[in-house]
Amino acid sequence: MSNVKLISTSSPDLIADIAYMARVSNPANQSNELTSRKLVEYLIKHKHWSPFEMCGITMEINTTRDIAHQIVRHRSFAFQEFSQRYADPAALEGWPYELRETRLQDTKNRQNSIETDDALLQQHWIAQQKRVIDTASNVYKWAIEHGIAKEQARTVLPEGLTKTRLYMHGTV
């Protein structure tokens, strides 16, 4: 399961900073923090986003490599990802793999999947994933033990099951 943790913000009081930026054309009232929250709510309601772009956040995202690839396509952010070229995925705490839930293809929306309550299918899906992980893990370990470079050995690891960590920085 993916999880996200806030690492840092560009300021200890983002609300006050966003309001300050929004009041650029009203210098006499620019430092008024009493109405900052109300102003930020107004900006959101009326979709005035430019003041939010003045403040930044950095988040830590723990997910699988296939989801990470989808995230990094958003080019308005800067990314730093755990490198399997230099480190073994086992360096991330816990088991370096994540078993995926059993979901069926939605027949009406190809970009959607739906839950299933088929217990037998779920058992088989978990067993198949474990077989892939066992095989890939053994091949990866064999490659490392035989001097194969990590950057080459990592190619056998399953993208959708192998965990990764990335840091994402962008504007609020």
In which residue ranges do the predicted regions lie?
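Family-specific signature for flavin-dependent thymidylate synthase
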Residues: 1-172
